[in-house]
Swiss-Prot record:
Residues annotated for substrate binding in this entry: R19, H131
Pfam families attached to this UniProt entry: Aminotran_1_2
Catalytic activity field: 6-carboxyhexanoyl-[ACP] + L-alanine + H(+) = (8S)-8-amino-7-oxononanoate + holo-[ACP] + CO2
UniProt source species: Desulforudis audaxviator (strain MP104C)
Name of this protein: Putative 8-amino-7-oxononanoate synthase
Coiled-coil regions listed: none
Cofactor(s) named in the record: pyridoxal 5'-phosphate
Gene: bioF
Length: 384
């Protein structure tokens, strides 16, 4: 085994793709200690900065004192608790769906919804740039997998005309995690209706960020949420841990009876459920936080434009594609030397030849942090 492991790791390293863990000690939503030095983070998914919001931390502490550190069992055994039930009701209201079902992670939620709904006689039409969890759900299902061009409704239509099966599914992200762009959801919904397909939208990065009161990309697109399937996470804008699926009323019942990644795993800890529930309440009670996020996004994108740097899209995720892993690593290391932490994103997380800096803006960033980072970024890209 040792020889195989060493040989594989050497190949990964030779391609500039070897990864390692870097311990960070959080100091707040956007700052951390790295090797004893304070750095500013422009890479987290903590879009609203709610991990340190007083209401969120207080509710988590209260749940910790009341319920302890873990759930102790699967939900169908003794792991279901009042906080999980309240969280599911709040998520259903947020998404405008009849019901929601919470999972330990967003990954397990996607495995469940696709891997359980689809089967060997079905066809799944999946965007080429969808997250690994969506692709793994497709492969797990055993259904025929057809990849359509990224965010391309014409490509999807052509393929829908070419491939038939018992049932058909259209799978996309609401806000793409690596490119920061949004698909034409109204067109996809129309195609789903026309071809009697089931539309599944992973709104992990749109939840809490887009749409009225942060209800997500489906609400932003004006699509009736009760007629499609939405998955998402609690670990990004909602400042906790976990995943969820919303959809027609019977979907939750179906998944809790059939989805292996729900049945055979320990329930989300009460402390995580409490934090996510509090974050949803903050979204409703403090709209200024979401407004602040978009003010920061605009400030950063305007700063990029002023420096002649690409700023496509309109979201808190800004990819600067540098091509080779080596160049992306050099740029990331230069930024770190200047006190900014933005790891290089390399294949297989992104397609070959598109290694990048994946920059994310948070509501918790200050104007001074944004302006300082813009100056540092210009220097890093020149020297990369």
């Amino acid at each position: 085994m040792r020889e195989f492991l060493e040989e594989t790791l050497q190949k990964i390293e030779a391609a500039g793709l070897r990864r390692s863990l870097r311990p960070l000690e959080p100091l707040g939503p956007t700052r951390a200690l790295f090797n004893g030095r304070e750095v500013t983070l422009f890479c987290t998914n903590n879009y609203l900065g709610l991990t340190h919001h007083p209401r969120v931390t207080a509710r988590a502490q209260e749940a910790l004192r009341k319920y302890g550190t873990g759930s102790g069992a699967a939900r169908l055994v003794s792991g279901h608790n009042p906080l999980l039930q309240a969280l599911e009701e709040a998520l259903a209201r947020c998404k405008g769906s009849p019901r929601a079902l919470v999972f330990p992670t967003g990954y397990t939620a996607n495995l469940a919804v696709i891997g359980t709904l689809a089967g060997r006689e079905d066809v799944i039409f999946c965007d080429r740039l969808c997250h690994a969890s969506l692709l793994d759900g497709c492969l797990l299902s055993g259904a025929k997998l057809v990849r359509f061009s990224h965010n391309d409704a014409d490509s999807l239509r052509r393929l829908l005309n070419q491939h038939t099966g018992r049932r058909r599914f259209i799978v996309t992200e609401g806000l793409f995690s690596m490119d920061g762009d949004i698909p034409p959801l109204p067109e996809f919904y129309t195609l789903a209706q026309e071809f009697e397909a089931i539309l599944i939208v992973d709104d992990a990065h749109g939840t809490g960020v887009l749409g009225p009161n942060g209800r997500g990309t489906v609400a932003d697109a004006g699509i009736p949420a009760e007629r499609i399937v939405i998955s998402g996470t609690l670990s990004k804008a909602l400042a906790s841990l976990g995943g969820f699926v919303t959809g027609p009323g019977l979907l939750s019942e179906f998944l809790l009876n059939r989805a292996r990644s729900f049945i055979f795993t320990t329930a989300l800890p009460p402390v995580s459920a409490a934090a996510a529930l509090a974050a949803l309440e903050v979204l409703e009670a403090e709209p200024a936080i979401l407004e602040g996020l978009w003010e920061n996004v605009m400030r950063f994108r305007q700063g990029l434009n002023a420096r002649g740097l690409p700023a496509s899209g309109n979201s808190p995720i800004i990819p600067l594609i540098l091509g080779s892993p080596e160049r992306a690593l050099r740029a990331a290391e230069n930024l770190l030397e200047q006190g900014y932490y933005v790891p290089a994103i390399r294949p297989p997380a992104v397609p070959p030849g598109t290694a990048r800096l994946r920059i994310t803006v948070s509501a918790a960033h200050t104007p001074a942090e944004i302006d300082g980072f813009l100056n540092a970024l210009g220097k890093a890209l020149e020297e990369a």
